[in-house]
Swiss-Prot record:
Cellular compartment(s): Nucleus; Cytoplasm
Name of the protein: Steroid hormone receptor ERR1
Residue(s) at site: Required for DNA-dependent dimerization: T124
Family listed: Belongs to the nuclear hormone receptor family. NR3 subfamily.
Effect of mutating K129R: Abolishes acetylation by PCAF/KAT2B
Length: 423
C-alpha cells in the first residue's frame, strides 16, 4: 500500500451544508474516547434518517425522534464549524450545541488531538465526529475564542465520560502484570484478573460510529450500499488510528505497518460488526443506527453476505465472547497478517506471540486454578480466525464487485484499500 493511503482526497457521496471555508480533504477518523457499551436509542432497522446524539445533544430544531427527519419551514442559521443548525452564538461564533460542547470540553480538558490523515479532513454534520483534530482546528479558524471558556467550571450530571488527554502506548516487548480492572457494562460473573495489555486494549477501543443514512436518498439498494461504503471508509481510518495504539505495532517499520493494515483491515471491520451483533437475534449491527436481518441485508444489496456474517456471529455467540476476549481477538486478527510484503516477519511474529500470551493469561485468570481449561478456551477463540478471514474475503469480493459496477460513489481511501486487497 502506498504512503498516500491515509492522505487521499475522497469522492463525495452527498453535498452537505458547510461554511464557505470548510476544507476539502481526506477520509477522516474518529478518535473520541472509549465509552462503555450501554443501552442506547433504538437502532434503525432500515434506512430512514438518523437522529444523532452527541455529548448531550438530542434532536435539533429541524429533527424529531423516531428516526424521521422533519424540516422546519423557518430559516436556519448554520453552525460555522459543521453546517448543522446553530443554536446561537457560542464563544463568539454561530454554532450548534454539539460543536459548542466539543470546543468547551477540549479547552477545559486541555486535550490535544492528532489527525491520522493530512490535517485537511472535511468537517460536516455527518462527519464531524470523524476527526477531532481537524474539528478543533476548524473551531479556531472560524473564530471560536478560547478565552470564552471558563476553566474553573466543568459539566456536572450531563457529562457522559471523562477524557484522558493522552493514552500512552505500553512498552513492548515486556511483561504484562495482572491486576484488577473495573469492566464497563456492569459486574462480571467471574472476576478474572486483567493484565496490563488487555486493560490498554480496552482503553484504546474506538468509540462507536453511526452510519447516518441519508433520509433524502432515493429508494432501492444503492443508497444502502453507499451508506455502508461511507461507513467503512470512516472505520478504516479509525482502524489505522487504533492499530497505532497497540503496543508493538508502532515499532514496526512504516512499510510493514501499511502491509499489515492493508491485508487485514476488512477482518477487523467484520469482527466489529460481529461483536456489535452479539446481543441481537439473527440481526447484524453494521452500526449503532443500522441493524439488518438476513432478508434486510439482501434487500439492501448485500446478496448472501448477511448469511455469511450471521454464521460468524452465531459462532461467537456460542462461545459467549466477552469484551476482553473481543479486544484481544481483534488485535490478534491484526497481527495475523499473511501479507507477503512484510519485511520484518519476525517483528510481526513477536507481536502475535505477545498477544497470544496475553490471551492465555486472561483465560487462565478467567478459568481459575486447574489444568488446561484456559488453553482450550483460547484455542476455541483462535479457531474463529479462519472463519473471520473467510467471511472478510466474501465482503471484500462483494464490494469490489460494487466498485467495478461503478454505480456507487466511494471515498478514495476505501477504493485504495479495496484495490490493494484484490490486486
Amino acid at each position: 500500500m502506498s504512503s498516500q493511503v491515509v492522505g487521499i482526497e475522497p469522492l463525495y457521496i452527498k453535498a452537505e451544508p458547510a461554511s464557505p471555508d470548510s476544507p476539502k480533504g481526506s477520509s477522516e477518523t474518529e478518535t473520541e474516547p472509549p465509552v462503555a457499551l450501554a443501552p442506547g436509542p433504538a437502532p434503525t432497522r432500515c434506512l430512514p434518517g438518523h437522529k444523532e446524539e452527541e455529548d448531550g445533544e438530542g434532536a435539533g430544531p429541524g429533527e424529531q425522534g423516531g428516526g424521521k427527519l422533519v424540516l422546519s419551514s423557518l430559516p436556519k442559521r448554520l453552525c460555522l464549524v459543521c453546517g448543522d443548525v446553530a443554536s446561537g452564538y457560542h464563544y463568539g461564533v454561530a454554532s450548534c450545541e454539539a460543536c459548542k460542547a466539543f470546543f468547551k470540553r477540549t479547552i477545559q480538558g486541555s486535550i490535544e488531538y492528532s489527525c491520522p490523515a493530512s490535517n485537511e479532513c472535511e468537517i460536516t454534520k455527518r462527519r464531524r465526529k470523524a476527526c477531532q483534530a481537524c474539528r478543533f482546528t476548524k473551531c479556531l479558524r472560524v473564530g471560536m475564542l478560547k478565552e470564552g471558556v471558563r476553566l474553573d467550571r466543568v459539566r456536572g450530571g450531563r457529562q457522559k465520560y471523562k477524557r484522558r488527554p493522552e493514552v500512552d502506548p505500553l512498552p513492548f516487548p515486556g511483561p504484562f502484570p495482572a491486576g484488577p480492572l473495573a469492566v464497563a457494562g456492569g459486574p462480571r460473573k467471574t472476576a478474572a484478573p486483567v493484565n496490563a495489555l488487555v486493560s490498554h486494549l480496552l482503553v484504546v477501543e474506538p468509540e462507536k460510529l453511526y452510519a447516518m443514512p441519508d433520509p433524502a436518498g432515493p429508494d432501492g439498494h444503492l443508497p444502502a450500499v453507499a451508506t455502508l461504503c461511507d461507513l467503512f471508509d470512516r472505520e478504516i481510518v479509525v482502524t489505522i488510528s487504533w492499530a497505532k495504539s497497540i503496543p508493538g505495532f508502532s515499532s514496526l517499520s512504516l512499510s510493514d505497518q501499511m502491509s499489515v493494515l492493508q491485508s487485514v483491515w476488512m477482518e477487523v471491520l467484520v469482527l466489529g460488526v460481529a461483536q456489535r451483533s452479539l446481543p441481537l437475534q439473527d440481526e447484524l449491527a453494521f452500526a449503532e443506527d443500522l441493524v439488518l436481518d438476513e432478508e434486510g441485508a439482501r434487500a439492501a444489496g448485500l446478496g448472501e453476505l448477511g448469511a455469511a456474517l450471521l454464521q460468524l456471529v452465531r459462532r461467537l455467540q456460542a462461545l459467549r465472547l466477552e469484551r476482553e476476549e473481543y479486544v484481544l481477538l481483534k488485535a490478534l486478527a491484526l497481527a495475523n497478517s499473511d501479507s507477503v510484503h512484510i519485511e520484518d516477519a519476525e517483528a510481526v511474529e513477536q507481536l502475535r506471540e505477545a498477544l497470544h500470551e496475553a490471551l492465555l493469561e486472561y483465560e487462565a485468570g478467567r478459568a481459575g486454578p486447574g489444568g488446561g481449561a484456559e488453553r482450550r478456551r483460547a484455542g476455541r477463540l483462535l479457531l474463529t480466525l479462519p472463519l473471520l478471514r473467510q467471511t472478510a474475503g466474501k465482503v471484500l469480493a462483494h464490494f469490489y464487485g460494487v466498485k467495478l459496477e461503478g454505480k456507487v460513489p466511494m471515498h478514495k481511501l476505501f477504493l485504495e484499500m479495496l484495490e490493494a486487497m484484490m490486486d
